[in-house]
Amino acid sequence: MFTHYSLDTLLGHSLTAIGRAADLVWWIFDVDGAEYSLHTQCTFRVLHDGEAVLSRSDIYCIRDDKPLGRDNSWFDYDVAELAPLLPAKVVSIECSEMNDLTICTENGLRIEKEPQ
C-alpha cells in the first residue's frame, strides 16, 4: 500500500482519457498497465500548441444545437475533439508551492491547473 503519492509517477506515461462527472473533471493516466486518475474541481485550461482548447468554464456553456441533457456542454464537445490526440506521453510536470500544476505532453498538450 502507498503511504504517499507523487505526480512524478506520471512522467513518461500516457494521458489516455479526459472526462467529467458533473463539475469534477477526471484525467486518466496509464502507468504500467494501471489506471491513475487525477480529479480536479478547480480552474484549469488545456492548450494545444499554445492555443486554448478546453477550460473549466466550458462545463457551464451549453450548446444550443443539442437538446438539454447529458453531454451537451462545450466541455463535452471539446473533449471529443481532443480524443484523437490521446494517448499523450507526459514529458514534464511542475507543481508550485501555491499548488499550481502544469502537465505537458510530447504532442503539445499543456494542462494548467490553478488553485482556487
Q: Each PLM stretch: what is its role?
A:
Residues 1-116:
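Surface-exposed, interaction-prone regions used to assemble/regulate multi-protein complexes
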